[in-house]
UniProtKB/Swiss-Prot annotation:
GO terms for cellular component: cytosol; small ribosomal subunit. Transmembrane segments: none annotated. PANTHER family: 30S RIBOSOMAL PROTEIN S13/40S RIBOSOMAL PROTEIN S18, SMALL RIBOSOMAL SUBUNIT PROTEIN US13M. Belongs to the universal ribosomal protein uS13 family. This is Small ribosomal subunit protein uS13. GO terms for biological process: translation. Residues 94-118 are annotated as: Disordered. Located at the top of the head of the 30S subunit, it contacts several helices of the 16S rRNA. In the 70S ribosome it contacts the 23S rRNA (bridge B1a) and protein L5 of the 50S subunit (bridge B1b), connecting the 2 subunits; these bridges are implicated in subunit movement. Contacts the tRNAs in the A and P-sites. Pfam families: Ribosomal_S13. The keyword RNA-binding applies. Keywords: Ribonucleoprotein, Ribosomal protein, RNA-binding, rRNA-binding, tRNA-binding. It comes from Alcanivorax borkumensis (strain ATCC 700651 / DSM 11573 / NCIMB 13689 / SK2). SUPFAM superfamilies: S13-like H2TH domain. PROSITE patterns: RIBOSOMAL_S13_1, RIBOSOMAL_S13_2. The gene is rpsM.
């Protein structure tokens, strides 16, 4: 298994698909990484040479991925909550942020139904 950005990526898949196993790299970014490194997208990871893997590692290192990206996202949410702005309050209460209705629906964000106590 090839290891890129602290993630074991599958060797029997195409390079583009394997790169999407890294948090913060989607299909578009994976395609651009393959284009800049000159690696064919349909090439399997096990067929790549060590130099090509190093080139991919160098390109991936330019982006914020995995733990750094998760930390950055959590810090942004924490900042919103500390500011006390509308989005921060909605995060704190566990409600939808972007104007969705909550009288009905929004079960995913609100969690399972609470029983009514009499």
């Amino acid at each position: 298994m090839a290891r890129i950005a602290g993630v074991n990526i599958p060797e029997n898949k195409h390079t583009v698909i394997s790169l999407t196993y890294i948090f913060g790299i989607g299909r578009t970014r994976a395609e651009s990484i393959c284009a800049t490194t000159g690696i064919e997208q349909t090439a399997k990871v096990r067929e790549l040479t060590g130099e090509q893997l190093d080139a991919i590692r160098g390109e991936v290192a330019k982006f914020s991925t995995e733990g750094d990206l998760r930390r950055e996202i959590n810090m942004n949410i924490k900042r919103l909550m500390d500011l006390g702005c509308y989005r921060g309050i909605r995060h704190r209460r566990g409600l939808p942020l972007r104007g969705q209705r909550t009288k009905t629906n929004a079960r995913t964000r609100k969690g399972p139904r609470k029983p009514i106590r009499k």
